[in-house]
Swiss-Prot record:
It comes from Brassica napus (Rape). Its EC number is 7.1.2.2. The lineage of its organism: Eukaryota, Viridiplantae, Streptophyta, Embryophyta, Tracheophyta. InterPro entries: ATP-synt_VA_C, ATP-synth_a_Xtn, ATP_synth_asu-like_sf, ATPase_a/bsu_AS, ATPase_F1/V1/A1_a/bsu_N, ATPase_F1/V1/A1_a/bsu_N_sf, ATPase_F1/V1/A1_a/bsu_nucl-bd, ATPase_F1/V1_b/a_C. Pfam families: ATP-synt_ab, ATP-synt_ab_N, ATP-synt_ab_Xtn, ATP-synt_VA_C. This is V-type proton ATPase catalytic subunit A. One of its GO terms (molecular function) is ATP hydrolysis activity. GO terms for cellular component: proton-transporting V-type ATPase, V1 domain. It catalyses: ATP + H2O + 4 H(+)(in) = ADP + phosphate + 5 H(+)(out). Keywords: ATP-binding, Hydrogen ion transport, Ion transport, Nucleotide-binding, Translocase, Transport. GO terms for biological process: ATP metabolic process. SUPFAM superfamilies: C-terminal domain of alpha and beta subunits of F1 ATP synthase (SSF47917), N-terminal domain of alpha and beta subunits of F1 ATP synthase (SSF50615), P-loop containing nucleoside triphosphate hydrolases (SSF52540). ATP binds at residues 252-259.
Amino acid sequence: MPAFYGGKLTTFEDDEKESEYGYVRKVSGPVVVADGMAGAAMYELVRVGHDNLIGEIIRLEGDSATIQVYEETAGLTVNDPVLRTHKPLSVELGPGILGNIFDGIQRPLKTIAKRSGDVYIPRGVSVPALDKDCLWEFQPKDFVEGDTITGGDLYATVFENSLMQHHVALPPDAMGKITYLAPAGQYSLKDTVLELEFQGVKKSFTMLQTWPVRTPRPVASKLAADTPLLTGQRVLDALFPSVLGGTCAIPGAFGCGKTVISQALSKYSNSDAVVYVGCGERGNEMAEVLMDFPQLTMTLPDGREESVMKRTTLVANTSNMPVAAREASIYTGITIAEYFRDMGYNVSMMADSTSRWAEALREISGRLAEMPADSGYPAYLAARLASFYERAGKVKCLGGPERNGSVTIVGAVSPPGGDFSDPVTSATLSIVQVFWGLDKKLAQRKHFPSVNWLISYSKYSTALESFYEKFDSDFIDIRTKAREVLQREDDLNEIVQLVGKDALAEGDKITLETAKLLREDYLAQNAFTPYDKFCPFYKSVWMMRNIIHFYNLANQAVERGAGMDGQKISYSLIKHRLGDLFYRLVSQKFEDPAEGEDVLVGKFKKLHDDLTSGFRNLEDETR
């Protein structure tokens, strides 16, 4: 007689062979060791125990396998069955991904909530990632029966929503001659829409693909990125730009605004699709995204307003979910991003935060009794981070028609105590090309985004020079001057603390005042106002141009302006006589982009001309 355990028979399923099963020998938190697993493969997906918990093999030794389980392991006992699936951890890719919210192993949270009627995910729940019964409007492209088709070719278009066209591609590892292509109509993800014959073997395809998450999707070639990622944040777009296909890190202590910057990028960046991965962060942050995004709209070039959620996919793996699934959530997110990249879209992926993933690696590494490296993190931490960040880039996609796509990765890092020498931060900085360092002191002064302009950097400035030359030939010189002013202010601050502001030369007083203008009225930005939540690039350029124009004119006036009685033009005189122009400089940020580019550029040009004439009149009066 089979033994009972917890009301369940400890027998094997009728349709499974006994050789497909191992049995649990040891349970240690999320790590399970199973015996009788001869023939299993690394990173093979397994089902552990009577609840069919999802796990992944991470070490093989003899016929025993070490498994990291992606669900709560409470209640597992020795000799519980472990079922092998003979396939790696994979994600389902097809229509229905956008606007959805998944957990770390691509289980749809809305569907689970409806089925279980509970706020928590039941253990061992098995729900298909995408709705197989939903009908999609299928429109085949210019292929006919008898045509040859290869991996990556786009053979149909599906209307996913009013913002995104979903292109259906042949999986990268398939090829052959078309024997059947479904006519235009409505089909579900179960329906066969394409049949191929290759070397006498027929194979049928639906609109759905599965892809192992740890394997990067193949591309024809990698390209040099040359288009900026415009975020709508002045400090990032003007001083530390990234590119479409770049890698960025946002390290910062708690309360510095990492999540707000990540969300601003998701809302306002010039990406076609966004994958937002909440990896080990607070559940409230994902709830905030879920509440905010459906109400947020973006204005399309044709004037239509569309919900941001229509281009967004959320992967939620909050801090109270099992730690092992944090690693899976990062890989799930990047695989979904690569899928949209292969359609020819520019995709942004936000990972908030990679430090929590590294902590999960540390915990599992400790349970495996591996040799710890710096701060207890495993020695392979840098290699794992690199394998993730290297999946970013601008690429030429496989198959036809010829198209380019890109994946931009923005990883938030939460170093304990804001210490940038933390192993995760230093390993990340050795890989990424853009560093947006957040400063606790700026955040405490309520200066947001709290990006420290003295320690941040971007290695893409040279790659973007051709774009800037086309957009505005003066911009590179203006930006260099603005950086010099901010750096000079930092040097002068020590002198000011010793001798006071009044003892400085007139030129230094102008430098300090211009730096204050740049800091408070240019770099600082209020994300909760209609006029400043998003700043178009033309507005950023004109605001900086006018501030630097004021700086140059003031310096020239001070140098040239000796009066008849030897009275020089001082900074206090400039501020007293040109107070209204100074006020207009401060108020540039209040110009609302909703008025349109032509109106705003006209206002900024008028201020530029008024500054020139104002200083000319001042010099004439004091001669």
